[in-house]
């Protein structure tokens, strides 16, 4: 079968830059790599074909020969080979292409012993507080289960007086090699999980793990103004890492209980206060509670309508990030009386007889609009 044009194989033009060649090859190599397509002969052939094309076009001298003479430049017996292709990939460097995908790649020397330090797991703790506690902020002791570094072996997993041995599978490199077509791929050692070490004399307290289960108690600070659903990160308070790895983090998820009187929206609080028809009509002064445990007075002017809001500046929740407080909004709800006695009914009947349109402007406007609607 005739070989395909190398530029067609990579899907690039003859004027493609080295970066464009590398990018095109990487996409094909990742797509058709045998590790991603085990047992797929067609993918393996395309993988090899792409590698052959890139091996030529990425080399300046070979590319020039190919541009001048095509595939004939690399056929045996000719004097035009300029070092030859020889069926392999010559001096092309593929390691940088696969570094982020496969780790150390190719048949080169190992970059030295690599120890895998495993970071500890993050933990979650759900903490419930009242709205008053969210207003004031608080310190609280919490207790939770976690893992801590074993003090007996100082976290290395070996008995006191012993040290981990070099892994017998990877020789301490943390990686093993396997052949994939034209390539030799270095992968994480399955025996030592990349640490390069084996525990041959395990610590009896932690069974060679380096960590132990523990119950931990710490004091946490809940800042003023914390809202429901706030997540607080406590760095390094999670589970212990292994093989010298860093601890994970502890995340506090704050649940602020709903309040019987106050409703919250961001840093503002809302409060509903019922008043009688007489107080709404004649005006009055009301006294309301505030979230800090104090009291505040509000003057209700005569003629106050149902649902009217009054703003008390700075009487809301503290800003969690910054200074100052939100506001408290008090909404007055006019309550219509029920179960009236004879005297109350008589007074209201008298009031109905003497009330006029001026006293009820909204009613007057409504009937004016209604009459206009009915006429039309």
Curated annotation (Swiss-Prot):
Role description: Participates actively in the response to hyperosmotic and heat shock by preventing the aggregation of stress-denatured proteins and by disaggregating proteins, also in an autonomous, DnaK-independent fashion. Unfolded proteins bind initially to DnaJ; upon interaction with the DnaJ-bound protein, DnaK hydrolyzes its bound ATP, resulting in the formation of a stable complex. GrpE releases ADP from DnaK; ATP binding to DnaK triggers the release of the substrate protein, thus completing the reaction cycle.
Subcellular location: Cytoplasm
Positions contributing to Zn(2+) 2 binding: 167, 170, 189, 192
Organism the protein comes from: Pelagibacter ubique (strain HTCC1062)
Family, similarity comment: Belongs to the DnaJ family.
Domain of life: Bacteria
Gene behind the chain: dnaJ
Disulfide bonds: none
A GO term for molecular function: unfolded protein binding
Zinc finger (CR-type): 137-215
Protein name: Chaperone protein DnaJ
UniProt-listed Gene3D superfamilies: DnaJ domain, Heat shock protein DnaJ, cysteine-rich domain, Urease metallochaperone UreE, N-terminal domain
Keyword terms of this UniProt record: Chaperone, Cytoplasm, DNA replication, Metal-binding, Repeat, Stress response, Zinc, Zinc-finger
